[in-house]
Curated annotation (Swiss-Prot):
Start and end residues of each stretch annotated as Disordered: 1-41, 91-120
Name this protein carries in UniProt: UPF0324 membrane protein RB9488
Record's keyword terms, sorted: Cell membrane, Membrane, Transmembrane, Transmembrane helix
Record's keyword annotation contains Transmembrane: yes
Organism: Rhodopirellula baltica (strain DSM 10527 / NCIMB 13988 / SH1)
Parts of the chain that traverse the membrane: 51-73, 160-182, 189-211, 221-243, 270-292, 307-329, 336-358, 368-390, 403-422, 437-459, 479-496, 511-533
InterPro entries xref list: UPF0324_pro
Keyword hit for Cell membrane: yes
Source lineage: Bacteria, Pseudomonadati, Planctomycetota, Planctomycetia, Pirellulales
Length: 543
């Protein structure tokens, strides 16, 4: 894989020349006017990296959901119904006074019935207590076989002593799945299997370092360590050629993003409803467009793709949005790496500083949580910062960020249209049609949106849907998604060379762009959050 042509897999098969026509010089009108023949939809769906990310993620989700579904007791509904009917029956048959009688007779009857009534009440209470103490807990049978290195303080072996079998399980699943996908796409499965153990070992090392208790307290997440591990290798001894078949940055991250779609449930938007939607969906596009305009017109950043990726990274939701946008605008690996580095650095700073600022300003937890959710890039960092302010702030912050995450697909789609229609179009040439926009559109976004809709429906309308979906996510797919992201960050580091990155840092313009854009984001998000949560919908969201 050549780091200078990272987009060859983003929207077309590997055996088709996707970039030569799109990236032709402005003077080559014939190339722009007559693009090469595009592959058929069937061939695209069987060889394209984006489509295979969807197929791989869909297979994993199907297996994960089926495992939880099959693991239910056959008589679960009967147990629940029987328990409920028993409680109701006991309450209804509890002895009561027979009716009016003489005063002395009533006293005698009351005395006789006191003990049975108390016993009946005690039985009902005990039944309810047992039901409360021993409810059926949905769990994924796959959970013991899927794990990541755990937390450790002094002894590094503590991180893997209890999770090594789960780590091995993840390795075998991803190795087998991606080897098969590579073979079907016309690549060498053997070359992938020879290199993948090293990439996976580096990802395990990143997880292991992030699990150290002091490191964890500062929320220095695995993504940062994975990048550093890869960068150290690529910028010192260099990335060995034999590793390149397993350095599949886009494939890993796209598969992880499709898995993420199952976690972004539309039904959960109702938790905050319109206030959160206004904060996330009105401010975000304004900040993105304004920041991109500022980078082009004021800072005059040479690379439009770098400008766009940084703008999306900062305004939408960090790394996931950066990668989706990079696929849509065909950004270079170095540009994506720079954007992610800026995002991770400022995420750590904002996660530590913003809760203190909110407390010092006397902002209440609801408003503070909404501010955190709309500004901090990483979902994990949002949750960590919200937890500092309390459970109420955590709930609001996480929900606003979840609402904002839905814009990943929308952003990628809009950027793809803008890029094909305006950025790469020759003004003297013919207007690019819908087919070219479809060809350039990152198809994995369709998987992200489809999984979000599908599992939202299952969550809302299926019997025991919330329990089933939560068990599936918590017991398997969330762990796999984390591994895919970690493998992607290791790959980004291995493909990034600082010598190629330095020209992009000339004059510090990317840093200035990020700081200015984030400053605008902070101001607009706070204003909108105040209007929505404290003025317009104050009664609705009041605790």
């Amino acid at each position: 894989m050549n780091s200078n042509t990272p987009s060859s897999d983003n929207s077309s098969p590997d055996n088709v020349s996707p970039d030569t026509s799109d990236m032709a010089s402005a003077g080559d009108d014939s190339a722009l006017a007559t693009p090469p023949p595009r592959p058929s939809l069937w061939k695209d769906m069987t060889t394209n990296e984006d489509w295979w990310a969807i197929w791989c993620a869909a297979l994993l989700l199907l297996i994960a959901f089926a495992a939880v579904w099959i693991g239910q007791p056959e008589n679960l509904s009967e147990l629940i119904a029987g328990s409920t009917m028993e409680e109701v029956s006991q309450v209804e048959t509890a002895p009561e006074n027979a009716g009016p009688s003489a005063e002395a007779e009533n006293e005698a009857i009351e005395t006789e019935n006191t003990a049975p009534a108390e016993n009946a009440d005690l039985e009902v209470a005990e039944t309810q207590e047992v039901a409360e103490e021993e409810p059926y807990e949905y769990a994924s049978p796959l959970k013991p076989f899927l794990a990541k290195p755990g937390k450790w303080t002094a002894n590094p072996l503590d991180a893997i002593s209890s999770s090594w079998s789960g780590i091995l399980g993840v390795f075998l699943i991803i190795a087998a799945l991606f080897a098969f996908a590579n073979q079907m796409r016309g690549k060498s499965a053997g070359a992938f299997l020879a290199a993948f153990p090293v990439i996976f070992l580096l990802a395990t090392l990143a997880y292991w370092m992030s699990g150290q208790s002091v490191v964890k307290a500062y929320n220095l997440e695995y993504a940062l360590w994975a990048l550093l591990v890869g960068l150290i290798i690529s910028n010192t001894v260099g990335t060995p050629d034999f590793l390149r078949p397993a350095i599949s940055t886009e494939f890993y991250i796209k598969t992880g993003l499709v898995l993420l779609g199952a976690e972004v449930l539309m039904s959960r938007l109702l938790a905050l409803g319109l206030p959160g939607v206004f904060v996330a969906w009105l401010v975000t596009p304004v900040v993105l467009i304004t920041t991109y305009w500022f980078g082009q017109k004021v800072l005059k950043i040479q690379s439009k793709s770098l400008n766009m990726v940084i703008s999306a990274d900062m305004s939408v939701c960090g790394v996931s949005a950066a990668i989706a946008t990079a696929a849509a605008c065909k950004a270079k690996k170095e540009e994506l790496s720079l954007s992610i580095g800026l995002s991770l650095g400022f995420t750590v700073i904002m996660m530590a500083v913003m809760p203190a600022v909110i407390t010092a300003m006397g902002i209440d937890p609801i408003l503070g949580g909404a501010w955190l959710g709309g500004t901090i890039d990483s979902t994990g960092a949002v949750a960590a910062a919200g937890a500092v302010l309390g459970d109420e702030a955590l709930e609001v912050a996480a929900t606003v960020k979840m609402i904002q995450n839905i814009l990943i697909g929308v952003t990628a789609f809009c950027v793809a249209i803008y890029w094909v229609t305006f950025v790469e179009r020759d003004p003297a040439g013919p207007r690019i049609g819908i087919s070219e926009i479809w060809y350039r559109f990152p198809k994995f976004v369709l998987g992200f949106v489809s999984m979000s809709i599908l599992f939202s429906i299952l969550y809302s309308y299926m019997t025991n849907g919330p329990e089933l979906i939560n068990a599936m996510i918590g017991g398997s797919t969330k762990t796999l998604r984390g591994w895919f992201f970690c493998l992607a960050f290791v790959s980004i580091g291995l493909e990034t060379n600082f010598r190629q990155l330095l020209p992009q840092l000339k004059g510090g313009k990317p840093l200035v762009l990020y700081v200015c854009g984030q400053s605008l984001n902070l101001v607009l998000t706070l204003v909108m959050a105040y209007l929505m949560f404290k003025v317009v919908f104050a009664d609705t969201v009041a605790p």
